């Protein structure tokens, strides 16, 4: 079942998570309420997935937790798999913000990438249980994998452009291929989250911080580590 809500702009979800409910022209009360409901369903789904695992959570349980009718769920998501697409949207929004900051030229690329890796860890870093559940859902569901892969491809391209900006400014070794550096950043991020999810201590932020410092030393121009 399809509805106009399903293709609603990802920026609404991104802005809600960032605490920036849009009030610009063209975004009316109905759109804001729709974004609120969509995000509420997503948050309730995450709580249930963290407790039981993706495959053990039903649409009925998600709508009951969100206090909406089952039909409402399908106004916003084609399938249960698409709920985790909101996670991908949120993460992609953070990458868009990074490329915007890089384009403005007011911050060092080191700062832009450092901020990005910390922001990308915010959602899975809510709890080790959630991180493990998200990882297992990616492995278990082809539908989820397809959604995540599409967004990761976009994110990878944008991160590569941030890297290219760093090379032009003399911060990142120009001999490195920007695409490979982007891949390494994503590998470091995802690998760190996986390892943290099996330990839980210290906080994920500390793990990401350490991982990023090693990553940056490997790509930085000598003397700018």
Residue positions per predicted region:
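Amphipathic alpha-helical segments enriched in hydrophobic/aromatic and basic residues
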Residues: 49, 58-59, 69-70, 80, ...
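Amphipathic alpha-helical packing segments from all-alpha helical-bundle domains
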Residues: 93-96, 126, 143-169, 179-187, ...
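An amphipathic alpha-helix adjacent to DNA-recognition modules
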Residues: 35-43, 55-56, 67, 76-100, ...
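Amphipathic C-terminal alpha-helical segment
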Residues: 123, 161, 165, 185-202, ...
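Amphipathic alpha-helical segments used for helix-helix packing
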Residues: 123-143, 194, 198
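Basic, helix-initiating cap at the start of DNA-binding domains
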Residues: 1-52, 56-65, 82
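Hydrophobic alpha-helical connector segments
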Residues: 86, 97-129, 178-185, 205-209
């Amino acid at each position: 079942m399809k509805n106009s809500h399903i293709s609603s702009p990802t920026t609404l979800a991104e802005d809600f998570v960032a605490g920036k409910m849009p009030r610009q022209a063209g975004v009316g009360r109905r759109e804001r309420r729709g974004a609120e409901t969509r995000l509420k369903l997503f948050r309730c789904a995450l709580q249930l997935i963290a407790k039981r695992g993706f495959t053990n959570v039903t649409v009925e349980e998600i709508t009951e937790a969100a206090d909406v009718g089952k039909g409402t769920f399908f106004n916003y998501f084609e399938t249960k798999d698409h709920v985790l697409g909101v996670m991908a949207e949120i993460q992609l929004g953070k990458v868009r913000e990074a490329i915007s900051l890089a384009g403005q030229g007011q911050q060092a690329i080191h700062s832009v990438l450092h901020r990005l890796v910390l922001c990308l860890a915010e959602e899975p870093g809510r709890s080790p249980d959630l991180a493990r559940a998200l990882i297992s859902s990616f492995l278990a569901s082809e539908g989820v994998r397809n959604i995540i892969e599409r967004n990761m491809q976009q994110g990878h391209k944008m991160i590569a452009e941030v890297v290219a900006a760093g090379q032009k400014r003399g911060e990142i070794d120009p001999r490195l291929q920007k695409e490979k550096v982007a891949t390494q950043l994503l590998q470091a991020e995802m690998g760190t989250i996986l390892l943290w999810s099996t330990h839980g201590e210290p906080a994920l932020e500390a793990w990401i911080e350490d991982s990023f410092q090693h990553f940056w030393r490997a790509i930085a121009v000598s003397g700018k580590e």
